[in-house]
Amino acid sequence: MPNLQGRVAFVTGGNAGIGYHTVVFLAKAGAKVYFGARSASRAEAAVERMYRENPGLLHGQVNWLQVDMASMKSVLAGCDKFRASESKLNILIHNAAHEGREPSNMADSGVQITMQTNHLAVFAMTQELQPMLRTAAAEKDSDVRIVNVSSNAPSLTHSDEWRPDFSDPHGGDIRYPAGQADGFLAAMKRYSVSKMAMNLLTAELQARYDREGVPIMVISVCPGAVYFKPQVDTENVEEMMRQPT
């Protein structure tokens, strides 16, 4: 990890799992880190643990903002609070995700909660924070990055020939990704389609920066199989692995 003194980072879903440890590593490298979380109690407990287990962190180096990626209103409010606190953003990591369940749960954006959390909120937050990312990119020796935490799930749930339908904003895979069926496999397909959308956004955003000559790197990464207690469901994982892709 390079020295990140003077850099500002934002990590969504930073109170647990991959997000938690991402916040810690960035802060230990010297960055000032903000993370988004839905629950105040869990966020405050996470901050307390970070400082307790890493006594070298400076006061005010780790901060949290109430951001629920399943709510567009919450995403926009969180961006407003972040802009009120900082003038630039060097590192934006979209880590928060929805696992694909609750097929009938619609977000305030009018789309199913999985697509809202894993794609639309990512798009909205990135656009809202564009000026701050570009401010950081204009600095000498800038190394601005947008990292989208994705998944290899699409390769497990869909064939190479399958194509999502993103053509109709009022239906298809934007509003109801991969249909409205319930159950574990349907949830995995829903999750996969939302991650496909995230990957397409990643590629398009990088292409636009390149055309403009803006020195910002945008990447999607698959962290691999990571133990995270709320996700562990041995019976359903075994069921998924028995299914042909």
From Swiss-Prot:
Oxidoreductase recorded as keyword: yes
Enzyme active site: 150
Pathway in which this enzyme or protein is active: Mycotoxin biosynthesis
EC numbers on record: 1.1.1.-
Consequence of gene disruption: Leads to the loss of pyrichalasin H production, but accumulates novel cytochalasans.
Keywords tagged on the record: NADP, Oxidoreductase
Entry superkingdom: Eukaryota
PANTHER family: RETINOL DEHYDROGENASE, WW DOMAIN-CONTAINING OXIDOREDUCTASE
Stated role: Short-chain dehydrogenase/reductase; part of the gene cluster that mediates the biosynthesis of the mycotoxin pyrichalasin H, a tyrosine-derived cytochalasan that inhibits the growth of rice seedlings, but also inhibits lymphocyte capping and actin polymerization and alters cell morphology. Pyrichalasin H is indicated as the responsible agent for the genus-specific pathogenicity of M.grisea toward crabgrass. The first step in the pathway is catalyzed by the O-methyltransferase pyiA which methylates free tyrosine to generate the precursor O-methyltyrosine.
Protein name: Short-chain dehydrogenase/reductase pyiH
Organism annotation: Pyricularia grisea
Name of the coding gene: pyiH
